[in-house]
Amino acid sequence: MKLDASLGTEGEYLKGMDKTARAAEDLGFAGLWTSETKHDAFLPLAIAANASHQIELGTSVAIAFSRSPMETAQTSWDLQDLSAGRFVLGLGTQVKAHITRRFSMPWDRPAARLREYILALRAIWGSFQTEGPLEFEGEFYRHTLMTPFFNPGPIEHPEIPLYIAGVNTRLAELAGELCEGFHVHPFHSPEYVRRTVIPAIAEGARQANRDLDQVTLATSAFVITGENRERATEQRESVRAQISFYASTPTYFTVLEAHGWEDVGERLSTMAREKKWREMPAIITDEMLAAFAIEAAPDEIGPALRERYEGLIDRVALYLPFVPDENDEFWQTVVESVN
């Protein structure tokens, strides 16, 4: 199991991205992932690629439908070339409200649209590598023009691993059919991964005559830890609040269903609509907390991760942002406990 680092998005993180990439690589992390919330997911990786040599660099979630496949293809191509083959493209759909109201882009049949988006990416990359014509015509996307002036040309590592980030079974099936990896949402349990995610990926792989082991499973894990009891208690309540937020969202009710906790989701959803944010964490019991998070001392996090994910997850990051010069001793201890 690989241990990765997740990049935070607070403060002036972009200005220190070169230092962050070197620090993550020096500590022994296998990969460094960006997400797309307050900032662009790709730009930090260009800086990281120039500052590092071995660590894998990827977008855990870059929003697909806010961009044309051509735009994503070009950016990914350049990052793959710049990093000498270390780039991993992770895509997500987001939800309808954000795509239509924040990005002002179309939304319909997201799984079918994402499937075609992936096929379009690979057609574009094929045109880049062969310097041949581009002929992709689908239901949602049409790319039929590529002249030498606009073609970046072949690169040394043209095979770009593509992951999908998702929660429900349709996207997991799509990953099994077409992709090299699937990012399991941080709000999960081993039981949910075992009973819902893996069978869906296996079904998608079966339909495409692929093997399940061709698909890497990655995730971020909620972790309750600390150098003392006070810090651990503080983190426990923080994780409890985060879980209550995710559990209130209907999109994630399938995770609760794996444990027979559907009523908890409905109750939290009602409280969220009533803006009872401060009262919501109390609904998450210690049993639920144990299902969705691990609790361990820093030097025991590695064994706890292996016990939880062995045979289920191939690579994992902690649901904590990695920032150099902040908690360096903690991160060194965690990496050593895993490796």
Question: Would you name each region that the model predicts?
Answer:
Residues M1-N339:
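Active-site-adjacent structural elements that line small-molecule/cofactor binding pockets in enzymes
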